């Protein structure tokens, strides 16, 4: 089997250190399935992981994947050889930048039948991230009618996570306010279903007041938590909930949350597979719900760019694009 990996952490300005490696195709054990990978999607987390310490070389990144089950471990009950599945994997195992991959069945689901592989593969990592935020952290209801009247502000609505988060929030009854800064990203947010799109390069508090937007129940920050920390505290309702997927780079005053009794949470969708939590199966269930909503027409895929062929050059170019931080939607590589 072919893999694209690297032997030491590197920045892109050092040149392309991705290389092709060959190894024997693995055999699935326990609850693992062996997937022949058809397409992958590259995420910002790939660019961060590329710069982290390599404990075992070569390091093979890649999280989102779609492919065909080729073999199953003895404890597998959810899948059979021939099933087409999608998933987001885990950073403590070999990634999807390869022709074959082992993955636990608990974080996998059957892929939607009504869209292409390079469309479906845009959804697992970002979709699970958004589902965990809305249902595990914000604890919104699975009954859309019970969420009517509640609102969420999604900062950076045109990114991969923001794109699917907007659709999920709308599907389950929330009023959705997102942010963007360019005409094309504003139009994309509207296409995803946002009720209101604000400019995140201008004062959000002022825009809320000018447009007479009430304080929101929830805020989902998908970009630069430090920059928006104080703004989010101003825009959240008392007893509201803020969740971010972006780690702090600076010290922030947690006491500032006290006056409104705000709950602040970090979302990291890899926590379940890394620690093999007892409820890891939730990721399978969330992916099943994504498939159901894609097939019923409630969600749309978020793929905007597709590269043909898994190669060091294509992977390097994908990382370059993501590090420019101007991507709309998701970037996919067909194997």
Curated annotation (Swiss-Prot):
Matches recorded under InterPro entries: ADH-like_C, ADH-like_N, ADH_Zn_typ-1, GroES-like_sf, NAD(P)-bd_dom_sf, PKS_ER, Quin_OxRdtase/zeta-crystal_CS, YIM1/Zinc_Alcohol_DH_Fams
Disulfide linkage: none
Q: Please list which residues make up the signal peptide.
A: none
Q: Has the keyword Kinase been applied to this entry?
A: no
Name the keywords, alphabetized.
Answer: Metal-binding, Oxidoreductase, Zinc
One Pfam family linked to the record: ADH_N
MF-aspect GO terms: oxidoreductase activity; zinc ion binding
The protein's matches in NCBIfam families, at most eight in alphabetical order, are given as: adh_fam_1
* Sequence similarity: Belongs to the zinc-containing alcohol dehydrogenase family. Quinone oxidoreductase subfamily.
Designated name of the protein: Zinc-type alcohol dehydrogenase-like protein SAR2277
């Amino acid at each position: 089997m072919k893999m694209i990996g690297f032997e030491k952490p590197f920045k892109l300005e050092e040149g392309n250190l991705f290389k092709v490696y060959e190894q024997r195709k693995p055999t699935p054990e326990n609850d693992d399935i062996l997937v022949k990978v058809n397409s992958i999607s590259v995420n910002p987390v790939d660019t961060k992981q590329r710069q982290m310490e390599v404990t075992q070389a070569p390091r093979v990144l890649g999280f989102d994947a779609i492919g065909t089950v080729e073999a199953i471990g003895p404890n597998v009950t959810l899948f059979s050889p021939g099933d087409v599945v999608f998933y987001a994997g885990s950073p403590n195992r070999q990634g999807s930048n390869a022709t074959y991959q082992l993955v636990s069945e608990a974080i996998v689901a059957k892929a939607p039948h009504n869209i292409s592989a390079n469309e479906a593969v845009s959804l697992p990592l970002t979709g699970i991230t958004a589902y965990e935020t809305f249902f595990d952290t914000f604890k919104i209801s699975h009954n859309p009618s019970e969420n009517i009247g509640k609102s969420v502000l999604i900062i950076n609505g045109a990114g991969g996570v923001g794109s699917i988060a907007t659709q999920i929030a709308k599907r389950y009854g929330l009023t959705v306010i997102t942010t963007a800064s360019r005409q094309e990203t504003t139009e994309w947010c509207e296409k995803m279903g946002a009720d209101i799109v604000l400019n995140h390069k201008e004062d959000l508090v002022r825009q809320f007041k000018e447009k007479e937007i009430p304080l929101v129940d929830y805020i989902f920050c998908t970009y630069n938590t430090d920059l928006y920390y104080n703004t989010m505290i101003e825009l959240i309702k008392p007893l509201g909930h803020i969740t971010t997927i972006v780690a702090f780079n600076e010290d922030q005053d947690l006491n500032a949350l006290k006056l409104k009794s705000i709950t602040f949470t970090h979302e990291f969708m890899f926590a379940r597979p890394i620690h093999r939590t007892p409820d890891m199966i939730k990721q399978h269930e969330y992916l099943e719900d994504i498939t159901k909503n894609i097939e019923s027409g409630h969600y749309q895929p978020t793929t905007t760019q597709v590269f043909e062929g898994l190669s060091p050059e294509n992977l390097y170019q994908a990382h370059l694009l993501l590090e420019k931080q101007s991507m709309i939607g998701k970037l996919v590589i067909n194997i």
